[in-house]
């Protein structure tokens, strides 16, 4: 039974956004516009980092970018067939993500140990982070900040297969073991937690998306994501399919950390992934 649904995308500190001289008109829907926003933040007098990230979530950066070029199904095919060197968009996506770090758009501490990266948004050091809808609550509690949060989907790329209608969504869930002697009672208990007044109490307590579709009021910190959830027509799995093969997800993650730490070039990244099978 689905519980605590989530949506992923770029969450940003609205106060820092304004401090860097940005307005709602600057919210990017394309990769070029995102780079323009990052450049504007870097060149401002704010001293802010445009973006930040944590080590365990670098796969979201590359997964989203690759899926924008190819679509999620072809991302999975690429991994399954290990055709990294044969798909030019694989290197192009690597170039894109690497430039965020090489050009200084990412925080100097990124990729940081979790949750030090995402906490920079609450500490007034970085403006944006690609994360799930749990991040505003986590950061607010960790940093004791009272900032407002904004949201936009990971942007589209030129000549890409998917646009901002592709969004990584999911949920936690309750299950009943097959050996349970009280299956119906367990189901009824889980249902009582995920619906009605109890669902809203949990939503209010941790600023999460309601599980019950009859509970239409989202927490204020997540409100900017509501229209994008309604426009979503292509649901992505975790990291947009980048972890579809459990035998190789650790190798992919290892190479992504080297790429984002600027320890290898995009060419080396693709070469190493091509040799993983």
Ranges and model annotations:
Residues 1-17, 49-50, 161-167, 235-242:
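A structural signal for short loop-to-beta-strand junctions that line the ligand-binding cleft
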Residues 27, 69-92, 141-144, 156-165, ...:
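Short, solvent-exposed loop/beta-turn-alpha elements that line the ligand-binding surface or hinge
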Residues 127-132, 150:
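Paired acidic/hydrophobic, glycine-rich loop segments that form the ligand-binding mouth/hinge
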Residues 206-216, 224-277:
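C-terminal capping/gating helix-and-loop segments adjacent to ligand/active sites or protein-protein/ligand interfaces
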């Amino acid at each position: 039974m689905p519980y605590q649904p989530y949506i992923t995308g770029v969450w940003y500190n609205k106060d820092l956004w304004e401090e860097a001289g940005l307005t709602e008109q600057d919210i990017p829907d394309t990769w070029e516009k995102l780079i323009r926003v990052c450049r504007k933040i870097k060149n401002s007098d704010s001293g802010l980092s445009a973006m930040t990230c944590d080590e365990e979530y670098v796969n979201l950066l590359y997964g989203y970018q690759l899926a924008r070029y190819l679509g999620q199904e072809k991302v999975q095919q690429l991994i399954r067939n290990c055709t990294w060197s044969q798909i030019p968009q694989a290197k192009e996506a690597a170039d894109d993500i690497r430039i965020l770090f090489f050009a200084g758009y990412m925080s100097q501490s990124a990729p940081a140990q979790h949750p030090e990266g995402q906490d920079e948004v609450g500490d007034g050091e970085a403006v944006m982070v690609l994360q799930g809808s749990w991040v505003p609550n986590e950061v607010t509690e960790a940093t004791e900040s009272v900032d407002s949060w904004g949201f936009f989907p990971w942007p589209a790329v030129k000549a890409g297969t998917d646009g901002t209608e592709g969004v990584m969504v999911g949920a936690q869930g309750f299950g009943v073991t097959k050996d349970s002697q009280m299956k119906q009672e367990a189901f009824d208990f889980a249902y009582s937690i995920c619906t009605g007044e109890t669902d809203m109490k949990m939503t209010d307590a941790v600023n999460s998306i309601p599980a019950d579709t009859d509970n239409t009021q989202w927490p204020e910190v997540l409100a900017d994501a509501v229209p994008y959830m309604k426009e979503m027509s292509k649901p992505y799995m975790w990291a947009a399919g980048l972890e579809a093969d459990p035998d190789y997800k650790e190798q992919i993650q290892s190479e992504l950390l080297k790429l984002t730490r600027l320890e290898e070039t995009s060419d080396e990244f693709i070469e190493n992934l091509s040799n993983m099978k």
